[in-house]
């Protein structure tokens, strides 16, 4: 049985008990959210996860970190270190998005070392093999679509991005639209190219029932990819974006009927004033399925600092109901991220998630804020560093410009806390 089916029967899995403890929430609430599809607990039956996560309505906002090779840089050891760093700094899940090298070896290595759920995009494997053999990323057969899904499932992948919402009708409309950047989703572009080249329907959409059978066998959580997500704020919230979302609604209903866990992926580049609209429409149209957002980025002009733009958009999106934030690194739109980029990206998105949790009234989030406030009041620097989401940088800054007395080198004897302590 899948986690959803277990919950529907009124029983609890070991993973449910563990996330209930982490979330400090009643187990019955966990079961209800999973049973109705308002939450997902990604956990392949073949993957032992030390730190399972629950994503959805009423739970803490989660953060995903993307790692993976490219044609220019494909070091397995570097990707393994990225995975370790991402987990160390609080990533709740990883996605292995490699497009070069021995993809199966890389994927299995990350799954083996990961204490958190691991996701993937199976279509990348088909595209890479096609490019290596024929120098064309879309020259593969319909069978390759499902075969790659099976391969990833057998390796232990917990959740998969499947771009099943791009139908021939959706694709025709985007081709004739006024969009500046027609398709910026890599997986979405590969599938769109395949559909145009072969003049056929999207196999992920056409064979979605078969896909559900595979997902159910392994308890894979399907993450319905938004192939039509906007790649610039100028294309945000357009007809094409929401047309695909209505197709995804249909697929959510099918998945739930089958007992398969499912969530929706979302944009993308969205101006700040449209974040609330996008999140609430995704929840409404998607029948309260969990929402997994890339960013969102409220400006296109933050190159080199996109992780900061991402944190701004992510905090607001989380407040309005987004459940799962995919981090963005300083290398976004520029290059393959380094290990340091991964660290910075995770910290930025964890800050966004913490801000959202606080604004949503999460008790655990408020308790942590109280501990930080008390630590500051008592000049307990070690405790402050432990509570900080950027603990290493905080400690480094403190040591670089020390103050020999209580307080810090910013205020010295003019410290407001010390003055109040003495005279109040």
UniProtKB/Swiss-Prot annotation:
Organism classification: Bacteria, Thermotogati, Thermotogota, Thermotogae, Thermotogales
Gene3D superfamilies reported in the protein's UniProt record: Radical SAM ThiC family, central domain
Biological or metabolic pathway of the protein: Cofactor biosynthesis; thiamine diphosphate biosynthesis
Protein name (Swiss-Prot/TrEMBL): Phosphomethylpyrimidine synthase
Keywords, in A-Z order: 4Fe-4S, Iron, Iron-sulfur, Lyase, Metal-binding, S-adenosyl-L-methionine, Thiamine biosynthesis, Zinc
Cofactor binding comment, as recorded: Binds 1 [4Fe-4S] cluster per subunit. The cluster is coordinated with 3 cysteines and an exchangeable S-adenosyl-L-methionine.
Protein source organism: Pseudothermotoga lettingae (strain ATCC BAA-301 / DSM 14385 / NBRC 107922 / TMO)
GO cellular component terms attached to this protein's record: cytosol
Gene assigned in the entry: thiC
Database matches in PANTHER family: PHOSPHOMETHYLPYRIMIDINE SYNTHASE, CHLOROPLASTIC, THIAMINE BIOSYNTHESIS PROTEIN THIC
Residues reported to bind [4Fe-4S] cluster: 408, 411, 415
Reaction catalysis annotation: 5-amino-1-(5-phospho-beta-D-ribosyl)imidazole + S-adenosyl-L-methionine = 4-amino-2-methyl-5-(phosphooxymethyl)pyrimidine + CO + 5'-deoxyadenosine + formate + L-methionine + 3 H(+)
């Amino acid at each position: 049985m899948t986690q959803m089916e277990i919950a529907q029967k009124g029983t609890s899995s070991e993973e449910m008990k563990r996330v209930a403890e982490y979330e400090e929430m009643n187990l019955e609430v966990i079961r209800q959210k999973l049973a109705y599809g308002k939450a997902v607990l990604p956990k392949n039956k073949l993957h032992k996860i030390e730190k399972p996560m629950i994503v959805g309505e009423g739970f803490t906002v989660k953060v995903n970190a993307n790692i993976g090779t490219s044609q220019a840089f494909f070091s397995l050891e570097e990707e393994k270190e990225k995975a370790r760093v991402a987990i160390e700094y609080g990533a709740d899940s990883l996605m292995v998005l490699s497009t070069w090298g021995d993809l199966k070896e890389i994927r299995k290595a990350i799954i083996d070392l990961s204490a958190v759920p691991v996701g993937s995009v199976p279509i990348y494997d088909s595209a890479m093999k096609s490019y290596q053999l024929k120098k064309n990323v879309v020259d593969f057969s319909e069978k390759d679509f499902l075969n790659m899904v099976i391969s990833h499932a057998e390796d232990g992948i917990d959740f998969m991005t499947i771009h099943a919402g791009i139908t021939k009708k959706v694709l025709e409309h985007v081709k004739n639209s006024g969009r500046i950047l027609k398709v910026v989703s890599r997986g979405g572009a590969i599938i769109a190219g395949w559909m145009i080249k072969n003049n056929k329907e999207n196999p992920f959409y056409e064979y979605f029932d078969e896909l559900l059978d595979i997902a159910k066998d392994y308890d894979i959580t399907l993450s319905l990819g938004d192939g039509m997500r906007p790649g610039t704020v100028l294309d945000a919230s357009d007809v094409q974006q929401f047309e695909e979302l209505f197709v995804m609604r249909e697929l959510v209903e099918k998945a739930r009927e089958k007992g398969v866990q499912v969530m929706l992926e979302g944009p993308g580049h969205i101006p700040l004033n449209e974040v609330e609209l996008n999140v609430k429409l995704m929840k409404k149209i998607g029948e309260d399925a969990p929402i997994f957002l890339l960013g969102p980025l409220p400006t296109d002009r933050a190159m080199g600092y996109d992780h900061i733009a991402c944190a701004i958009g992510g905090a607001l999106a989380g407040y309005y109901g987004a459940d799962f934030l995919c981090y963005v690194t300083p290398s976004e739109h520029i290059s393959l991220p380094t290990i340091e980029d991964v660290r910075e990206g995770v910290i930025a998105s964890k800050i966004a998630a913490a801000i959202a949790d606080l604004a949503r009234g999460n008790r655990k989030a408020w308790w942590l804020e109280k501990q930080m406030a008390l630590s500051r009041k008592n000049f307990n620097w070690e405790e402050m560093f432990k509570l900080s989401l950027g603990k290493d940088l905080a400690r480094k800054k403190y040591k670089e410009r020390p103050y020999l007395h209580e307080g810090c080198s910013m205020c010295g004897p003019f410290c407001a806390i010390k003055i109040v302590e003495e005279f109040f």
